């Protein structure tokens, strides 16, 4: 697949790397592992892009609702309806294909999930829904973002690009340094269930906690000159 993608790009002379490569490769790989029919793979692209935009759509919608409270104007629910319809479509497809894999298992990940058992019981629909959502969302954007970010880093740092060309053995460390610099996952959020103390910070129950990967991955107490892209960095793999 990599060769095919590169062959399709070469005659163009230039390309949109995100659209022509970084987006295509993870979808193909994920679909092959899951057992998604080729005809349905574009649906995954649409759902993933929509899920990524959904959080921003929700924020804008909340702003409009707050404004409407002051202006007494009716709230436009078109965006909310579109979001709900897209979510329903995504979960309906997931349930259908998992049900199909349960009846006719194949050598793929969805078949394994659909037919897995805990204490002799098949997984609940709620568990299957959660697995489906996690797989199609988390299995794509991190790889796409890392591929795109790596090309950007190499473009901005020609000296590091030349080092990699001259010494391909640096590739594993190059990948680790790219992940550190890019931090393809922005943050992880949690909600406290009871009073909790982390370091000097006391948090009450129900408080929101956010861990920013990018901040940790550029911690100067861990990484010397943390904003520098260095494919020979000795502790590049210490990223989160």
Predicted stretch roles:
Residues 1-240:
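Cytochrome P450
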């Amino acid at each position: 697949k990599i060769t095919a993608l590169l062959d399709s790009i070469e005659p163009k002379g230039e390309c949109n790397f995100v659209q022509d490569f970084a987006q295509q490769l993870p979808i193909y790989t994920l679909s092959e592992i899951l057992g998604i029919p080729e005809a349905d793979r574009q649906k995954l692209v649409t759902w993933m892009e929509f899920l990524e935009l959904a959080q921003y759509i929700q924020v804008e919608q909340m702003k409009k609702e707050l404004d409407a409270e002051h202006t007494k104007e009716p709230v436009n629910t078109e965006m909310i309806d579109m979001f709900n319809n897209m979510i329903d479509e995504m979960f309906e497809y997931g349930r259908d294909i998992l049900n199909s894999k349960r009846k006719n298992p194949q050598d793929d990940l969805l078949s394994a999930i659909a037919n897995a058992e805990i204490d002799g019981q098949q997984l609940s629909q709620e568990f299957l829904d959660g697995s489906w959502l996690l797989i199609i969302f988390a299995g794509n954007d991190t790889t796409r973002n890392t591929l795109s970010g790596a090309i950007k880093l190499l473009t901005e740092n020609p000296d590091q690009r030349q080092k990699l060309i001259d010494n391909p053995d640096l590739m594993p460390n190059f990948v680790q340094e790219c992940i550190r610099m890019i931090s393809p996952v922005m943050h992880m959020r949690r909600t406290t269930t009871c009073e909790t103390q982390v370091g000097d910070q006391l948090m009450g129950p129900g408080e929101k906690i956010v861990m920013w990967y990018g901040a940790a991955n550029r911690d100067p107490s861990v990484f010397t000159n943390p904003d520098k892209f260095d494919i020979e960095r000795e502790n590049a793999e210490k990223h989160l």
